[in-house]
Amino acid sequence: MTIECANERLEKTRNAAHPFCVVCGKANECGLGLQFSLCDDGSVEAIFDCHEKFQGYRDILHGGITSALLDGAMTNCLFAHGIVAVTAEMNVRFRHPIKLGLPLLLKAKITARKQRKKLTAKSHWLFPKQKPKRRNF
């Protein structure tokens, strides 16, 4: 299957199964509006603009928004492979703060298929070439 066909499947599946999703749903006027696309390696990616309205602590993206975006990326990765599923378990490790005001690349990939109904996917951020500052809270 070509990337173009897979991206069409991704969009069709997302629109049918997830139209009001706060992360990627086109029918959700209050949503974040991320547009995921399939990459050559089977992962999906989207750009997220870390606007200050998504702030948690000063100048840092809220952890709940971070988690929702990571979950949405993994879901869209499944959609790109023709799989509709829900998240049964999710673990997030916050290694360093995500600064506001910078566009970030969000990626997700299926990493394991253990059984017919059990998949593992991982998602992560790619940061601009700028070392995050440590903060004392």
Task: Map each language-model feature to its residues.
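Preference for bulky hydrophobic residues occupying beta-strand positions
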Residues: 46-48, 92, 123-125
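Non-catalytic linker/capping segments at the edges of enzyme domains
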Residues: 1-47, 51-52
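Short coil/loop residues immediately preceding or within conserved phosphate-binding loops
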Residues: 31, 89, 120
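HotDog/MaoC-like acyl-thioester-processing domains
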Residues: 1-13, 98-100, 110-137
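Hydrophobic core residues within well-ordered beta-strands of beta-rich domains
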Residues: 42, 86, 104, 118-119
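Short histidine-centered catalytic/ligand-binding loop motif
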Residues: 50-64
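Hydrophobic beta-strand-centered segment that forms part of the acyl-chain substrate-binding groove
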Residues: 72-105, 110
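Active-site helix/loop of acyl-thioester processing domains in fatty-acid/polyketide metabolism
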Residues: 40-43, 60-85
